[in-house]
Amino acid sequence: MESSRRPLGLTKPSAGXIIKIEAERISPSRLQLLNPIPGVWFPITLGFRALPNSRREKSFSLHKDKECLLPMESQLHSKRDIGTDTTDVPLKHLMASRSSYCPDGIFTILEQGPMLAQSMATISKELSGSQANRPRLGPLPILLKGTQVAMRLFLLGLRPVRYCLKVFMLKAQEGLHLLVDLVRGHNPVGQIIALEAVPTSASLPLL
């Protein structure tokens, strides 16, 4: 009769009771780690929560790990568009098979599409041709256009505009006189007469 009675006070629970208590304390988030998630790897050790000691080395070993999938997308996004080599070694091994992955950690397009390369070539040819065929204006046509613009702006009657134009015309006259002296040493007399025929300050309206 006494052996069938339950002893009073604290008793040491059995191994089965300990496993049951530990299983009840596991949260749903921890239970999700035991299920394989496609796309990611991480090592998880199934066994007691305590570290192995000399008594348990035969029954419990860290080498018997179960590999499960772990999300690596957050790490990949964090390493994106980085110019320096800050990627981890495991990440490099995981991404070595991707064609858009470069060793310096930059995700980029390695080759341009045929249509894109063709269009860029035609655009560059058009730009180079337009620059080559574009006539270069000499100093005399530029001064003539500037004089025409100045004559139109004089009609506005604004003092700041007139002041700026006065300074501009004085600088233009100074450059024109220097240009005449330069042309006299290198060009025939006909071009000198053409340069001297440019209207001076006497033919312009008074400021």
Curated annotation (Swiss-Prot):
Cellular compartment(s): Virion
Main location: virion
Chain ranges passing through the membrane: none
Any one of the GO CC terms: virion component
Record keyword Coiled coil present: no
Keywords for this protein: Virion
Stated family: Belongs to the coronaviruses I protein family.
Annotated function: Structural protein that is not essential for the viral replication either in tissue culture or in its natural host.
Other noteworthy facts: The gene encoding this protein is included within the N gene (alternative ORF).
This protein's name: Protein I
Source organism of this protein record: Murine coronavirus (strain JHM) (MHV-JHM)
